């Protein structure tokens, strides 16, 4: 875990769910790791990069409306690893110059995307 506020800022991106007990293992499989810490019994926090956190919290009144995107260095490796853990994408988008976004939807409809630039070989 990175030193908190070492560079002066931390980003916490939230995802609200109705069923935390169902959501937490799904996010563990998607991200390939357990939470970095548990804020309380219905809130899990993953450090997805230094000073960048993904928060999954039980808040039924706000569940199902999140849209988060993480750009990663090796999109294909990320997608393959998630598939190996039983998590398959719902969709894929391709933008100008070959930039891609692979979209996952959790059991409650929240959208988590992984983005990547085209490979140098392309």
Region annotations inferred by a language model:
Residues 68-87:
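Mid-chain, well-packed structural core segment of small domains
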Residues 31-38, 87-93:
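Short secondary-structure junctions
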Residues 33-66, 111-118:
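Conserved short beta-strand elements that form part of the metal-binding/catalytic scaffold
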């Amino acid at each position: 875990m990175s030193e908190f506020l070492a560079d002066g800022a931390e980003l916490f991106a939230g995802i609200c769910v109705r069923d935390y007990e169902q959501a937490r293992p799904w996010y563990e499989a998607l991200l390939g790791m357990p939470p970095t810490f548990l804020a309380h019994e219905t809130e899990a926090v993953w450090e997805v990069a230094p000073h960048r956190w993904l928060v999954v919290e039980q808040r039924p009144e706000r569940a199902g409306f999140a849209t988060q995107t993480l750009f990663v260095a090796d999109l294909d490796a990320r997608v393959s690893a998630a598939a190996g853990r039983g998590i398959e994408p719902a969709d894929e988008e391709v933008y100008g110059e070959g930039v891609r976004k692979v979209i996952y939807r959790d059991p409650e409809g929240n959208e988590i995307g992984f983005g990547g630039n085209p490979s140098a070989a392309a």
